[in-house]
């Protein structure tokens, strides 16, 4: 039996030139893996992701959530604060809702050029989401 995996995407619009490329690579990989992207929510930035992730996790037809974002280093430590807090809360939500939430967020501490070289983080996050859903379902059988 083939397990259909339904995904929700939460995408940051900050650094949209990069997150758009990440989103497209992620969509293509989801299709390649036979997963369906049921919902996409675009939020202002990575820090804003947890609430959107929570709303998607509450949906019965979402098996996992993929986060897609890019945090580029600035002149302060703001990028580190944003990524660390978002990642912590995203992980907490996965445990709270008992569904995978994958981290397709590049950064902190990277330049714009490094961010462009890491657009495959969206693909990796989709891969991890699909694997986690399938492996967790296998545990239930």
Swiss-Prot record:
Record's subunit section: Forms an icosahedral capsid composed of 60 subunits, arranged as a dodecamer of pentamers.
Family: Belongs to the DMRL synthase family.
GO biological process, one term: riboflavin biosynthetic process
Function, as annotated: Catalyzes the formation of 6,7-dimethyl-8-ribityllumazine by condensation of 5-amino-6-(D-ribitylamino)uracil with 3,4-dihydroxy-2-butanone 4-phosphate. This is the penultimate step in the biosynthesis of riboflavin.
Coiled coil: none
The protein's annotated pathway: Cofactor biosynthesis; riboflavin biosynthesis; riboflavin from 2-hydroxy-3-oxobutyl phosphate and 5-amino-6-(D-ribitylamino)uracil: step 1/2
Organism (species): Methanocaldococcus jannaschii (strain ATCC 43067 / DSM 2661 / JAL-1 / JCM 10045 / NBRC 100440) (Methanococcus jannaschii)
Catalytic activity: (2S)-2-hydroxy-3-oxobutyl phosphate + 5-amino-6-(D-ribitylamino)uracil = 6,7-dimethyl-8-(1-D-ribityl)lumazine + phosphate + 2 H2O + H(+)
HAMAP family xref list: Lumazine_synth
UniProtKB keywords: Riboflavin biosynthesis, Transferase
Protein name as annotated: 6,7-dimethyl-8-ribityllumazine synthase
